[in-house]
Amino acid sequence: MELKRVVVTGLGAITPLGNTLPETWEGIINGKSGAGPITQFDASKFKTQFACEVKGFDPLTVMDRKEARKCDRYSLFAINAAKQAIDDAAMDLDKEDKNRIGVIFASGIGGIKTFDEEVLGYAKIKDTIGPKFNPFFIPKMISDIADRKSVV
């Protein structure tokens, strides 16, 4: 079996330290903590009141509002970081064979925010005709959906 060469040409990052790779790196070398008070949900009933949340993130930098509504927040992070990596690589996508371009990213659980919203929303509604889940519930939630959204 012949091994193919892989070349990393660009990097991107969305982290609690910053929404770009330079911001994140700056935070790392300066010993900055990404931890702070939980703001994404009401954590008043939990012992822990702090987390490492991504702050100041604007998904509309890489996609329109209509597309962004179909994605869980983690997918928006992945898509944005992939776009940063493409920009960092200074690739002219009109001149590249897109079948030879790939992005590697990792997520432990996927769309937990979507899962939370749907399940908690369902628990609050007493409806005799059954559950009324968002039709994008599963596509937004599954962890491999972010790599299906193209930025190229």
Specify the residue positions occupied by each region the protein language model found.
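Conserved "HGTGT" condensation-loop signature of ketosynthase/thiolase-family condensing enzymes
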Residues: 1-152
